[in-house]
Design a protein with these regions (language model features):
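ER/secretory pathway lumenal C-terminal domains and tails of membrane proteins involved
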Residues: 2-185
Length: 185
């Protein structure tokens, strides 16, 4: 196909990033380790990699937003959260209904309620995977509330809150995610 969807956290994995750049027929970027020793430091690493992919691939590239995604307006048109279906499908698609069905019938969130779910140590972004649920499902909490379905709204809120609380991200960052949930009225 002519579209590529990139899970942002995977860009920290050198083998993935190299394979992606090869697939897109663009040059690879420096590694995060190289950035750590550079004057600019690692803070701009992810943003630089994303910009490199967007500008050099010369094709539609979409990013799966997750907890590590930079809050940069220039990337908004490159975000993917089932939005491509709206753009390219010839048939009507109700992504809220699909997300609700997945929450109610397919996703198994119980592990998020464990006091301390431990992700794989060898992958830097692995703990942040839990935060992907927040990006994808916070709007569904709002939809449940609008529909008067407090049972599912409260249950999903508990799961998503646990996903945030049980990470080791800084407290200030946790508060941003919790605020996202609390504003889903």
């Amino acid at each position: 196909t002519d579209k590529v969807i990139v899970p942002v956290s995977f860009l920290y994995i050198n083998a993935f990033r190299k394979a992606l750049c090869q697939r897109l027929e663009i040059s690879d970027m420096e590694t995060e380790k190289d950035y750590a020793s550079a004057e600019s430091g690692v803070d701009g690493y992810l943003q630089d990699v994303l910009e490199h992919i967007i500008h050099n691939s010369k094709r539609p590239t979409y990013f799966f937003p997750d907890g590590s995604f930079p809050d940069t307006p220039s990337f908004k048109k490159n975000l993917y959260n089932e939005g491509l279906v709206f753009r390219y499908s010839t048939h009507p698609y109700d992504n809220v209904a699909v997300a609700k069905r997945n929450v109610e019938e397919r996703y198994a969130f119980q592990y998020l309620m464990e006091p301390k779910f431990v992700c794989e140590e060898q992958w830097k972004g692995s703990e942040r995977i839990q935060l992907n649920y927040m990006v994808m499902l916070a709007p569904i909490v709002k939809s449940y509330k609008e529909d008067g379905d407090t049972l599912h709204a409260n249950q999903l809120t508990r799961y998503l809150s646990a996903a945030v609380v049980n990470t080791s991200i800084p407290q200030e960052e946790k508060q941003k995610y919790i605020h996202l949930l609390s504003t889903a009225k």
